[in-house]
Amino acid sequence: MLDSRRVFVLAAGAILFYQLILPPVVGLADNGDFAKVIGRFNLRGRVHKTYGYIDNVYTIRPENHWVSGFVSTEIPLAQLAVWLNRLISKDGNFDLRCIGVVHGALFLFAVWLFVPLLAGVDRGVRWAMCALALFMYCDMMYVNSLNSFYMDEPSYLFLLLTVVEFLRVIQFGRRLDAVLLMICPFLAVASKTQHALLGFWIALLLVATAGVLKPIRRSGWYTTAICLVLTSVLMIWKAQPADYASYPLYNVTFEEILPHSQNAVRTMADLGLDDSYRTCIGKKAFLAGSGMDDRGFRERFIERLSYGKLAVFYAKHPAAAFHTMIDSLSDQGRQHAFGNFDISAGYPPAESKAFALWSDVKSHVFYHHGLAFLLAFLSLVTLFAVLLLVEHKSLPRGVLTAGFCLIGAGFTELGLSTLCDSMDLPRHALLFFALFDMIALACVYLALSSGLRKTKWRTAAAVPARATITAP
């Protein structure tokens, strides 16, 4: 009999090895953010073609040194990659595949932990769920960023581990799983300020289900939840330079909200901006002429407009929020539009097409169709909620609460990725994509389990009936 766990992990490992290790190596091009992580390790891409190409090789030189002021769990992961590189590097340069190995190992660890959760279900359902998870999460949209230094990556990987460990604690009640469940949320939340809000949902889940999370006592989970909330607050408050939030605020304000406003002067006033900012409309924060290269301008702008004020603006102007969300989702309905190959591969700036079927399907349905994307998400969430309520008696205690926290996290990432910035939208939506696919996967599992259980019940009920008819 085939061992589904070994087959699944080996299949996932083979896909990662083919994509991340074998030439031509696939990754996700730097948009300028890598230095926030790797500058402290004296690394810089040898060619460094922003957006268009990845760098397989990074030079290690003192003049590359820069400490960015950002806090992220990607930094210790990069340190592990640097140590690994020291063991295998022949020329003293850094090989990008080392970070791919570190990220890939975490992904495969999540896969290894996931499969036993299906041990008690029907064999056909188990293999179907493994195949579907492989199809979704080994897609190029997720795999290419494993060979990168983006700070979203640990949030994605440790979120997967958090979800898997929660289900393992519910199902198996092992101490090691409980300890990992206490650790992984912190590593996910501490990856990037944008994703720190997820800590509140996870903390709520730990408090609400503390009674069923064995063998750790309730007080341990309450303490973990409190510490997780404090970590989330610290990440929002101190994990990046004080004026860095002005950049995404600038982008969404002047590139998305104001260009679509029918009365720009009134909209600027509602946002707390005066007419002097009219010249910024249509500009990107990181490009010349935006004014953002002037620290004084940034400080004045952030004094006038904050995320809190933006949230109030959206609440007062739901039509603007809706239009911004739809416009953003229209751009998000595809994999990252960055180059995936090193320039030495001889390709023009291009995206890999291998193992990209799931991305292609979503791109065909959702790209430039933001309303369809939003309706699909709302429909999926509604279906998931209905299935949870219908099936809750057959589910382990705590799963119903976890399901609704998952929905809440999905809406949180939807809002963060669509309403708070207007640049690199598919990359910023990585966790929203992951949660979208997670909810879809859960819907398939609940539907298959329910259908199989009803089929068995009908079969069992039919057997005595036939026996009664044919009895002498």
Question: Predicted segment positions?
Answer:
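Transmembrane signal-anchor helices characteristic of membrane glycosylation enzymes that use polyprenol
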Residues: L2-D55, P62, C227-A239
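Membrane-proximal stem/loop segments at transmembrane-domain junctions that anchor or position
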Residues: K36-W66, A239-P348
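Short hydrophobic/aromatic helix or loop-helix immediately within or flanking a transmembrane segment
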Residues: D55-R97
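Membrane-interface anchor segments at the N-terminal boundary of transmembrane helices
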Residues: D91-L106, T324-L406
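Aromatic- and kink-enriched transmembrane "portal" helix at the membrane-lumen/periplasm boundary
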Residues: L96, A131-Y156
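Transmembrane-helix motifs of polytopic, lipid-linked glycan transferases
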Residues: V101-R123, L161
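Membrane-interface transmembrane helices that cradle and orient dolichyl/undecaprenyl
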Residues: T162-L180
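Membrane-interface alpha helices of multi-pass inner-membrane proteins
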Residues: A178-T193, L228
